[in-house]
A protein has these predicted regions:
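Catalytic domains of cell-wall/extracellular-matrix polysaccharide-remodeling enzymes
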Residues: 1-122
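Short, solvent-exposed mixed-charge patches
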Residues: 127-129
Length: 129
């Protein structure tokens, strides 16, 4: 993580503050380690499955059929057909009334919990009275 962060910082001039755990695998120890580095973990609730090298139409149909308000969609930078699929995905979602926003507008500040679908929810507060 440190080596990747250094490379990203060198290229962008900005240190990363978010991280997607590989395969979405994490536990309390991973989250604690990430947070000790000044970062927050993020998850997704729509997997494009673009890594399976599906064609652009299949990726587009999969994503647009699963997106809901507040969705975070997982794409991979090395996937073969993602660049071809993205314009159609964006056109469809915008035509359906969605707005594409930076992930920073979708994630909650701690404390929060993440459910099995990857969605964040404010952590429940426990009353001590």
């Amino acid at each position: 993580v440190t080596a990747s962060n250094e490379r990203i910082s060198a290229v962008t001039g900005v240190p990363p503050t978010l991280i997607r755990c590989p395969y979405g695998e994490y536990d309390d120890h991973v989250i604690a380690a990430i947070r000790s580095m000044g970062m927050e973990p993020i998850q997704w609730d729509v997997d494009s499955l673009d890594w399976k090298d599906y064609d652009a139409d299949t990726i587009c149909r999969r994503v647009t059929s699963k997106v809901q308000p507040g969705s975070i969609v997982l794409f991979h930078n090395a996937a073969l057909h993602t660049p071809e699929a993205l314009p159609a995905i964006l056109d469809c979602l915008i035509n359906d009334g969605y707005t594409v926003v930076p992930i920073s507008q979708l994630i909650l500040d701690p404390p929060y919990t993440i459910d099995h679908t990857g969605r964040q929810f404010p952590a429940e507060t426990v009353s001590t009275t």
